Amino acid sequence: MTKHVEIFTDGSCLGNPGPGGYGIVLRYKQTEKTLAKGYTLTTNNRMEMLAAVVALQTLKEPCQVTLTTDSQYVRQGITQWIHNWKKRGWKTADKKPVKNADLWQALDKETARHKVDWHWVKGHAGHRENEICDELARTAAENPTEEDTGYQAS
């Protein structure tokens, strides 16, 4: 029987671009685990995406996942836009390279391992887990330890 895991994610950036971080809450039955990491130079969207990628990578086996994010960019990108990007060889409708293609490809790979149901919540609206993720992401952004090697300043 496939395990059902709840995942909550958030990304933060102090300046955009600037130092950033992600926060994750993973819940399986009654057990919760939190993850966070800060990066010296990145963007808000990259941190939102990286949170989802890392959370899904953390799962050791294929799972039924309910993933809740406050990022429409992530939710719409992975459920709607990605299909045409892949058909066009990771180009947008106007033939430009898709931004953050490295993370979209990683997210695509991870979602293929799991059955993911994507949910959106309004940020800063009192959702307990989203508020926890927001705090984790902000704290991580204030104390960055990693380099976002995929980030390219444009």
UniProtKB/Swiss-Prot annotation:
Function statement: Endonuclease that specifically degrades the RNA of RNA-DNA hybrids.
InterPro entries, sorted: RNase_H, RNaseH-like_sf, RNaseH_domain, RNaseH_sf, RNaseHI
Keywords (A to Z) from UniProt: Cytoplasm, Endonuclease, Hydrolase, Magnesium, Metal-binding, Nuclease
Family that this chain belongs to: Belongs to the RNase H family.
Alphabetized CDD domains for the sequence: RNase_HI_prokaryote_like (cd09278)
Protein name from the UniProt record: Ribonuclease H
Binding-site residues, Mg(2+) 1: D10, E48, D70
Residues at which Mg(2+) 2 binds: D10, D134
Catalytic activities: Endonucleolytic cleavage to 5'-phosphomonoester
A molecular function GO annotation: RNA-DNA hybrid ribonuclease activity
Domain of life: Bacteria
Enzyme class of the recorded protein, top EC level: hydrolase
One GO cellular component, as annotated: cytoplasm
Domain RNase H type-1 as annotated: residue spans: 1-142
